Amino acid sequence: MITDMQLAIFSNVLGVFLFLLVVAYHYINANTGKPSAKAK
């Protein structure tokens, strides 16, 4: 069985990974989109 400590570590690692995935997605999406208004 999974102990409480293993479950806590797993959930924390999963949460950090998903948070970083969302941050990376937004960073990539913001920097590789349509040309900005500054490019005129």
Swiss-Prot record:
Residues 29-40 are cytoplasmic. One of its GO terms (biological process) is protein N-linked glycosylation via asparagine. It is a single-pass type III membrane protein. It is found in: Endoplasmic reticulum membrane. Keywords: Endoplasmic reticulum, Membrane, Signal-anchor, Transmembrane, Transmembrane helix. One of its GO terms (cellular component) is oligosaccharyltransferase complex. Coiled coil: none annotated. Residues 1-7 are lumenal. The keyword Cell membrane does not apply. The chain crosses the membrane at residues 8-28. The keyword Metal-binding does not apply. Its main location: endoplasmic reticulum. It comes from the Eukaryota. It holds the Pfam family Ost4. Subunit of the oligosaccharyl transferase (OST) complex that catalyzes the initial transfer of a defined glycan (Glc(3)Man(9)GlcNAc(2) in eukaryotes) from the lipid carrier dolichol-pyrophosphate to an asparagine residue within an Asn-X-Ser/Thr consensus motif in nascent polypeptide chains, the first step in protein N-glycosylation. N-glycosylation occurs cotranslationally and the complex associates with the Sec61 complex at the channel-forming translocon complex that mediates protein translocation across the endoplasmic reticulum (ER). All subunits are required for a maximal enzyme activity. Component of the oligosaccharyltransferase (OST) complex. This is Dolichyl-diphosphooligosaccharide--protein glycosyltransferase subunit 4. It comes from Drosophila sechellia. The lineage of its organism: Eukaryota, Metazoa, Ecdysozoa, Arthropoda, Hexapoda.
